[in-house]
Amino acid sequence: MDSQGRKVIVVDNGTGFVKCGYAGTNFPAHIFPSMVGRPIVRSTQRVGNIEIKDLMVGEECSQLRQMLDINYPMDNGIVRNWDDMGHVWDHTFGPEKLDIDPKECKLLLTEPPLNPNSNREKMFQVMFEQYGFNSIYVAAVLTLYAQGLLTGVVVDSGDGVTHICPVYEGFALHHLTRRLDIAGRDITKYLIKLLLQRGYNFNHSADFETVRQMKEKLCYIAYDVEQEERLALETTVLSQQYTLPDGRVIRLGGERFEAPEILFQPHLINVEKAGLSELLFGCIQASDIDTRLDFYKHIVLSGGTTMYPGLPSRLEKELKQLYLDRVLHGNTDAFQKFKIRIEAPPSRKHMVFLGGAVLANLMKDRDQDFWVSKKEYEEGGIARCMAKLGIKA
């Protein structure tokens, strides 16, 4: 609550999951899949204790996915289907989840850096005109607030987008921010493709969720890709079973590390971009020479796609190799002094929400210079809102 007794709500609209709750809390009050489903055939009224409705959102949609045609309203951190996104927000603010009266609430929304302005403008319009929130703030780089750091590099990879954002003394350096539109959802798609090559067919919209769960359970990042490839070819060490919802059992071998490898080698899915290690190295090396060592010592991982076992050690190995080759030109004596620290907090899946909860709590009473009020929106329109956020409309 702020000093006027208004609730301060934080919503992290992820491409894969919505995390929502209150300012100053240590964990989201609700986490549910950002998906909307409609029944393929209206035959039954109930399945177990879930009533089948014309429109299903969130967990119920995920549980009954075999009977539904499923849509994901967001892609790469950008809302592609505003009607379906509206259903997700109705679910978020309605009696099923937060159960709030928006007119009495302040709302902090999150978004990935380098998102198009049009997406942000439409978000403001919907929140003020459709829901009537009292005041709103939209923030991009929130992870460091959760870690209590003022300087560092955030490597955030969720379901829709991966980005690397350096923050110095509390200011995000937008000119150095790097964005890669490869994240969890692309890994799931690639895993579906790899399984298809083995003869397992997952082409129904509901199978996507099944493969996502399989990916979370079994995939990992290879420390040494060549060694893992040899193991996959010559032994059964990597082979693991997975039971599908219909009871069938499938085996995964090399696919377990091949799917997430696209983070480091985007060319595997025909994307001509640098991989994660290259992007991070390029981002830090492009920063001011005085800040680089600070950045190397404070690399913070955030988002669900950074949860793969082996990711921090692989990132560290490749960063060190790049630094040795390109900066020190193979001088191993100087390399001894080079220090890297990659922080992988256990709660990093919800890091953006936690940072938002910290920021919203700090700023809850700063109406003049922080929150954009409904009155300001009505008087000055979207240009006024953007100006207050420090964004050129």
Curated annotation (Swiss-Prot):
InterPro entries: Actin (IPR004000), Actin/actin-like_CS (IPR020902), Actin_CS (IPR004001), ATPase_NBD (IPR043129). Keywords: Actin-binding, ATP-binding, Cytoplasm, Cytoskeleton, Nucleotide-binding. The keyword Iron-sulfur does not apply. Its main location: cytoplasm. It comes from the Eukaryota. GO terms for cellular component: Arp2/3 protein complex; cell cortex. Pfam families: Actin. It is found in: Cytoplasm, Cytoskeleton. GO terms for molecular function: actin binding; ATP binding. GO terms for biological process: Arp2/3 complex-mediated actin nucleation. Coiled coil: none annotated. The keyword Cytoplasm applies. ATP binds at residues 158-160, 212-216, 303-308. PROSITE patterns: ACTINS_2 (PS00432), ACTINS_ACT_LIKE (PS01132). Component of the Arp2/3 complex. Belongs to the actin family. ARP2 subfamily. Functions as ATP-binding component of the Arp2/3 complex which is involved in regulation of actin polymerization and together with an activating nucleation-promoting factor (NPF) mediates the formation of branched actin networks. Seems to contact the pointed end of the daughter actin filament. This is Actin-related protein 2. It comes from Caenorhabditis briggsae.
